[in-house]
């Protein structure tokens, strides 16, 4: 019975992963066509935590390979000199940058990292339709796009970029 259960679980997981991949690709193509509209970013402080006086904050956007525009908060240490190590931060599925991932990013910036906390595709201020879809494939691509974006930032040491999420 134990072997049958493990086989059933493995088959179900494989089916879900395959179906998720196909759905992600299809949804990504649909989103790419719909992403021509601009994001409606808020520029006032909208987090559940106070802004640190040790960092500068600004909103940035970047696009993943599916054409979905991602919204992010960038935190830069005020005492920054030279090229900085960088970290891209995002929370679990359904979380937004105004919550814990933003707090982690800001705290890491206080410690000398240039950071971004971004909303994954289909979530928060980022683009993508339908809304509130969770796709492991696209989430992975979002992190790749975040690393690519950070590597183009003038203040970032492209050899020292990490992710957290």
Each language-model region and where it sits:
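Glycine-rich "HGGG/HGxG" loop immediately N-terminal to the catalytic nucleophile
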Residues: 99, 122-134
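Short beta-strand element of the alpha/beta-hydrolase
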Residues: 83-92
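The serine-hydrolase catalytic nucleophile loop
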Residues: 94-106, 120
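Alpha/beta-hydrolase fold nucleophile elbow
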Residues: 155-165
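Conserved alpha/beta-hydrolase
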Residues: 107-125
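Alpha/beta-hydrolase active-site loop
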Residues: 133-154
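N-terminal cap/lid segment of alpha/beta-hydrolase-fold proteins
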Residues: 36-82
